[in-house]
Amino acid sequence: GLGDVYKRQEESGVEKGIVYVITEHTTTGITVNESLPCVEKDLMECLDRIAPEDYPYHHNHYLPTYGTIGGNAPGHLKSLLTGNHCVFPVLDGTLKLGHAVDIYFCEYDGIKNRRYMVYVVGERG
């Protein structure tokens, strides 16, 4: 999960508001789900069935603007399916997530140096 989301909210001093988490990349996702290895595995297997690596995607050709072959179409599609952001309420100075809820940063294009942004907006105590 994204443990520093809690830290950022606490440091903000916001008592009532929202926390907004968004990725900066088009082949990553931000999603919310139960924090269990079996759920993570099921999610990835489902996404692999929907957007398999070996499909002949239109994106897998030379892209002059990038000077390379776009071989990451499955990553773009998986990102669309999981989404690129999530929003949670802050009440009484506490980030409100369900009992078994965790926030996931999902990488769909190999190991890379990636970033996401956390915005905390609201009324301070």
Predicted regions and their residues:
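Short, small-residue-biased leader/transition segments that mark boundaries at the very start
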Residues: 1-6
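Short, charge-patterned binding micro-sites
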Residues: 18-31
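Mid-chain, well-packed structural core segment of small domains
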Residues: 48-98
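Divalent-metal (often Zn2+) His-rich catalytic cores of metallo-beta-lactamase-fold enzymes
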Residues: 33-35
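A short aromatic-anchored loop/beta-hairpin motif
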Residues: 38-39
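Phosphate/pyrophosphate-binding loops at sites that engage ATP/ADP/AMP, CoA/4′-phosphopantetheine
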Residues: 8-19
